[in-house]
C-alpha cells in the first residue's frame, strides 16, 4: 500500500477507482465502501485509491468542541492495508484547505491526479467548503466529466444504522463489545505507560497507568473492563479500571491496567495497545480497601472465565 501525506507528491494515475471520506473508525459501513472500491478496481485492473484527511476536519472547524475520535491514524492505515487498498492519500486538513470548494477539490486533486473511472462513496459523505460536495453534487459532476458515481446505502443491524456517531455513543456508555461488533475490529488504542501512585501494588494488583497516544482519543465510560493488551508484540489479558478511584477519595481521572501474566514490572515509558473486550462492572466506592481487594479478586475470576472466548 502506497501512502502519501501531502498533496504535493501524490502520483498521476492513468485511471483508478476512488473513494473519499474521513473514515473515523473504519467501521463496517466504511469497510463495505472500501471493499467495493477494491473489488471494482481489481475487476478492471486499475488501482484503488482512498482519499482521507488528517486531522479530523472537525478538530479544525470546531476548536471549542473537539470531537473525540475512534482511532489514531496509524490504526486507520493498518486497517486500510488489511482491506487491500492500493493508494492512500492523507490530506493535511487545515483552515486553508477547509476553504477549498468542492469543484476545485475534484478538479485539482481527484481528477487531475487519479483520473477516476468511478468514484464510490457512502450515503452521508460531504466534502468541500461548507460541505457543498454532496452525493448528488458528485453524481452530477461525474456526468459532466464522464465517470460513474456509486453512492452506497448505509449498513444496518437490528434496524440501527452503523455510523461513527452511534459507535461513539456506545463507547461513551461502556458498551464496548457492541461497539467492536459495529466497528468490525476490537475497540482499543495505543497508549504510553506512565508512572502512577503505586496504589494497585499495595492492594496486591500491580497496575500500569496509561494515557492514549492520540490526544483526542475517545475512551470508554468509567468502570472495570476485561482487556487484551499488546506489549512488544506479545498479547496479554488483564483487567482495567477507568475512573477516579473513589474508595480513596481521589478525583483525578486515571486509566490503569493489571495484566495477569506480565513477567516484567518495568514497562514505564513503553507503548502498549489496550483493547476493551467487555465491561465487567461500574466503578464503585467501597467502605474500605479490604472490600475493594475482595471485589478485585472476583473481577479477576470473572475475567479469567472469559479468556477462553477470546483465545
Model-derived regions: residue spans:
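Glycine-rich, Lys/Arg-enriched anion-binding loops that position phosphate/diphosphate groups
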Residues: 142-241
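Phosphate/ribose-recognition catalytic cores of enzymes acting on nucleotide-derived substrates
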Residues: 196-311
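Short acidic-hydrophobic, aromatic-tinged amphipathic segments that line or gate anion-handling sites
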Residues: 2-8, 89
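A short acidic, often aromatic-flanked loop/helix-cap motif at beta-alpha or helix-coil junctions
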Residues: 9-12, 95-98, 156-160
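N-terminal catalytic cores of NTP/NDP-binding nucleotidyl/phosphoryl-transfer enzymes
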Residues: 7-72
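N-terminal Rossmann-like or analogous alpha/beta NTP/dinucleotide-binding catalytic cores
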Residues: 59-123, 127-145
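Residue-level signal for inorganic ion chemistry
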Residues: 27, 80, 119, 179, ...
